[in-house]
C-alpha cells in the first residue's frame, strides 16, 4: 500500500477502521456520534505534538525537542483525519479539490490583507452578472437538470415563476448548483472586467462586494478560486446581504469618493436612495431602476467605461 498517495491512504485506513465499525451500515446519527469520538481522539493527538516541544513558558529548564514524537503523533492525527473522511464518504479527489480551493483563498486573502485604503476613490463591484455571468450558466444548468426551459431573460430577479410551473424550489437548485462548484466555471464578463482593470489603472481602490452566502463554504471558497483563476486584482472582498449597510461601516463612507456597479434592482435602488452613485448594466429584471436619481443605466452591449464621466 502506497501511503504517499491520498486514495491509497484512505483505503488503508478504511481497512483498519473496518475492524471496529462498518460506516456503510451506520445511520446519520451513528455517524455523528462516531465523528465526535474521532475528533476528540484527533484533538488528543494534536495535543501530543505540542508536548514534543517546550511549551510551558514558566519552566526554566528546556528539554530537547522530541522530533520522533512530532512525527508519530502527526501520523496518528493524519490517520484520524483519514478516518473522518472515510466516515462521511469523502474521497481523495474531493479532498484534493478542497485543498486547492483553500489554497486559492489563502493566497488571495494574503494578497489583499496587506492593503489599506489610503484615500483613493473606490469602486464597489458586484460579482454575479457584473464580473461573472451567473444567470446564464445557472439557467442552462437548471434547464438541463429539470428538462424545462428556464429563461435567463425573465423579468424576475429570482426567476421564481418558471420554477413554480414545474413545482421546483429554486433555492434548492441554487444550493445544488453551488455545492456542485458551478460558480467556479462561470464565464467572465469581459466588458465589466475591462472596466475594473481600467479603474485600477486610474488609481481606484477596487472592492468586490457580493451577496453570495458566505456561510455556504463551497460558495465562499469557489468565489476566491474564480477571482484568482481569472486574475481579478481587487483590493478587498466582502460578502454582505445588505450592501449599503456594509458600505456605511467602511472608513471611506464619510468623506470618501465612491460609486457602485451592481445589476440588482434592490441593491441599486438602496445605494441610489442613500446618495450613492451606481452604474447599472441593463438586464431584463432591473428596468425599474432606469431613470432613478443617482443611477447610471448602461444599455446592453455598451462599453461601461464610456459612462464613468457621469458618475
Task: Give, region by region, the residue ranges found by the protein language model.
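Flexible "arm" and connector segments at domain edges
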Residues: 1-119
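Active-site neighborhood of HAD-like aspartate-dependent phosphohydrolases
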Residues: 119-172
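A short, structured active-site edge motif that brings together acidic residues
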Residues: 209-214, 224-246
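Short acidic-hydrophobic, aromatic-tinged amphipathic segments that line or gate anion-handling sites
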Residues: 237-241, 294-306
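Conserved Lys-Pro-Asp/Glu-containing loop-to-beta segment of HAD-superfamily phosphomonoesterases
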Residues: 240-272
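Acidic, Mg2+-coordinating phosphoryl-transfer loop and its flanking beta/alpha structural elements
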Residues: 260-299
Amino acid at each position: 500500500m502506497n501511503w504517499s498517495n491520498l486514495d491509497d491512504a484512505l483505503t488503508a485506513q478504511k481497512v483498519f477502521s473496518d475492524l471496529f465499525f462498518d460506516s456503510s451500515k451506520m445511520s446519520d446519527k451513528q455517524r455523528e456520534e462516531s465523528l465526535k469520538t474521532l475528533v476528540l481522539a484527533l484533538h488528543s493527538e494534536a495535543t501530543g505534538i505540542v508536548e514534543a516541544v517546550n511549551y510551558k513558558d514558566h519552566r526554566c529548564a528546556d528539554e530537547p525537542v522530541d522530533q520522533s514524537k512530532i512525527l508519530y503523533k502527526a501520523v496518528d492525527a493524519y490517520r484520524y483525519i483519514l478516518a473522518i473522511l472515510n466516515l462521511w464518504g469523502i474521497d481523495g479527489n474531493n479532498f484534493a479539490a478542497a485543498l486547492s480551493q483553500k489554497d486559492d483563498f489563502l493566497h488571495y486573502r494574503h494578497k489583499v490583507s496587506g492593503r489599506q485604503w489610503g484615500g483613493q476613490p473606490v469602486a464597489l463591484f458586484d460579482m454575479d452578472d457584473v464580473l461573472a455571468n451567473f444567470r446564464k450558466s445557472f439557467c442552462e444548468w437548471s434547464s438541463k437538470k429539470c428538462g424545462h426551459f428556464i429563461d435567463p431573460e425573465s423579468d424576475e430577479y429570482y426567476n421564481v415563476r418558471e420554477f413554480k410551473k414545474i413545482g421546483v424550489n429554486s433555492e434548492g437548485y441554487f444550493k445544488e448548483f453551488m455545492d456542485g462548484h458551478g460558480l467556479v466555471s462561470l464565464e467572465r464578463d469581459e466588458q465589466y472586467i475591462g472596466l475594473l482593470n481600467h479603474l485600477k489603472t486610474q488609481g481606484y481602490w477596487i472592492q468586490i462586494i457580493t451577496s453570495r452566502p458566505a456561510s455556504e463554504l463551497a460558495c465562499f471558497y469557489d468565489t476566491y478560486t474564480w477571482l484568482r483563476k481569472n486574475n481579478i486584482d481587487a483590493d478587498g472582498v466582502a460578502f454582505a446581504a445588505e450592501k449599503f449597510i456594509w458600505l456605511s461601516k467602511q472608513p471611506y463612507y464619510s468623506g470618501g469618493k465612491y460609486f457602485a456597479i451592481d445589476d440588482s434592482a434592490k441593491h441599486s435602488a438602496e445605494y441610489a436612495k442613500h446618495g450613492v452613485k451606481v452604474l447599472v448594466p441593463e438586464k431584463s429584471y432591473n428596468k425599474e431602476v432606469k431613470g432613478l436619481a443617482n443611477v447610471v443605466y448602461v444599455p446592453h452591449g455598451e462599453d461601461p467605461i464610456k459612462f464613468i464621466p457621469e458618475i
